[in-house]
Amino acid sequence: MFARVFKAMPARAPAFTSVNASIQSRFMATVRQGRPATERATFTIRDGPIFHGKSFGARSNISGEAVFTTSLVGYPESLTDPSYRGQILVFTQPLIGNYGVPSAERDQHGLLKYFESPNLQAAGVVVADVAEQYSHWTAVESLGEWCAREGVPAISGVDTRAIVTYLREQGSSLARITVGEEYDADQDEAFVDPEQIHLVRQVSTKAPFHVSAADPQCHVAVIDCGVKENILRSLVSRGASITVFPFDYPIHKVAHHFDGVFISNGPGDPTHCQDTVYHLRRLMETSQVPIFGICLGHQLLALANGARTIKLKYGNRAHNIPALDTTTGRCHITSQNHGYAVDASTLPSDWKPYFVNLNDSSNEGMIHKTRPIFSTQFHPEAKGGPLDSSYLFDIYLDSVVKYKNHQLAFHPNRNTVPSPLLVDLLAKERVGVQPTIGMQNVAAAAAAAVAAA
């Protein structure tokens, strides 16, 4: 059999020549873009080691919080996840970029098929080795070309094992990527802490938008703290039309027009979102509407109920983290991306832990004892990652439809009450969200935040 296969193979010389021509063409395109393929770059951890490598992204400098992910695949989804806003993402997988970067194609709902937001969200990218040549039927450009086009610096050729070991032992640290210049150890002001910036304000839609289901069974209000596209898809594909609101929208004032409320993921310190916490508290005081929160949404829901959140030493960022369902005893492999967690010991008496992380015993979810309200720290929509817990969307939407039917039974004219939101006139995608910003703009944003305080 193998003899027949090898005999049928074409001569290699023309193919090799074609590959060489392709490589040369890409190299020349890179040079024409003004991004030298082997320009020196430096990754510096504040009060820590310095690593020298090569730039393969934008020719700019950036600072942020250095965090790491152990995910093997899904780098386009990770890098466009708004939860990574302001962070320099270190990949433990040795080779990144071998299947390229897909297009910004949208599905039948108008949602991005391959990205979690329209722009690259991470402040910087750190890899051991980057694939200059890619191969995948959805790919339209290389990882380096994408980073350069999005204005995000990236560095390869560094010892990511040593970086991750340092971050694991010392905790997530401020770091800096510089391209084409030496780092001055005295420039302490070059390190900007994104945790001091209200990052949710940067990634949340600036005005409501609406996405209709093909066969709508209910209408859900989504609080956008940096929502991932696949979360929206997970709701819409199950028959929920959604109206997405800015993070600080007074949702309790319009909740009676909806069958459920969902609180999304997002970046940064949850205590920055005091407006959201207040509106959620008022929502639970004035409405019995079902509520589901994911990631940052889980933390905000906990804060609204009087619990506290804590910052983890280095966070949980991977696609293979085990979480125990305390109600069934079943273990799920989950996708996670968070640097904060809910302190389960501070949950009020009418709440109980729903999921527990089997690696570090941190809280991964909570559920109300008598009301249809629950939340998870992990991402049941995955993308990338396993779909073990995607059934949670079904549980949530079952409670939403049940609530809707109950409301109609007692208020048969509920659907004819005029709504202040004319959904047909709303935008169909997030409004006014800006691409990730460079180090200088981050510093300016931090200074503005301090001045405003």
From Swiss-Prot:
One annotated Gene Ontology cellular component of this protein: mitochondrial matrix
Domain of life: Eukaryota
PANTHER family, alphabetized: CARBAMOYL-PHOSPHATE SYNTHASE ARGININE-SPECIFIC SMALL CHAIN, CARBAMOYLTRANSFERASE FAMILY MEMBER
Active-site feature positions: C295 (nucleophile), H379, E381
Cross-referenced CDD domains: GATase1_CPSase (cd01744)
Domain Glutamine amidotransferase type-1: 219-406
Pfam families (alphabetical): CPSase_sm_chain, GATase
Keywords per UniProt: Amino-acid biosynthesis, Arginine biosynthesis, ATP-binding, Glutamine amidotransferase, Ligase, Mitochondrion, Nucleotide-binding, Transit peptide
Gene3D superfamilies registered for this protein in UniProt: 3.40.50.880, Carbamoyl-phosphate synthase small subunit, N-terminal domain
Presence of keyword Magnesium: no
Family membership noted in the UniProt record: Belongs to the CarA family.
Purpose: Small subunit of the arginine-specific carbamoyl phosphate synthase (CPSase). CPSase catalyzes the formation of carbamoyl phosphate from the ammonia moiety of glutamine, carbonate, and phosphate donated by ATP, the first step of the arginine biosynthetic pathway. The small subunit (glutamine amidotransferase) binds and cleaves glutamine to supply the large subunit with the substrate ammonia.
InterPro entries in the record: CarbamoylP_synth_ssu, CarbamoylP_synth_ssu_N, CarbP_synth_ssu_N_sf, Class_I_gatase-like, CPSase_GATase1, GATASE
Pathway named in the protein's UniProt entry: Amino-acid biosynthesis; L-arginine biosynthesis; carbamoyl phosphate from bicarbonate: step 1/1
Name of the protein: Carbamoyl phosphate synthase arginine-specific small chain
EC number: 6.3.5.5
GO terms, biological process: 'de novo' pyrimidine nucleobase biosynthetic process; glutamine metabolic process; L-arginine biosynthetic process; pyrimidine nucleotide biosynthetic process
GO MF annotations, alphabetized: ATP binding; carbamoyl-phosphate synthase (glutamine-hydrolyzing) activity; glutaminase activity
PROSITE patterns (alphabetical): GATASE_TYPE_1
Cell compartment(s), UniProt: Mitochondrion matrix
Subunit structure: Heterodimer composed of 2 chains; the small (or glutamine) chain promotes the hydrolysis of glutamine to ammonia, which is used by the large (or ammonia) chain to synthesize carbamoyl phosphate.
Matching NCBIfam families: CPSaseIIsmall (TIGR01368), PRK12838.1 (NF009475)
Transit peptide location on this chain: 1-28
HAMAP family linked to this entry: CPSase_S_chain (MF_01209)
Main subcellular localisation: mitochondrion
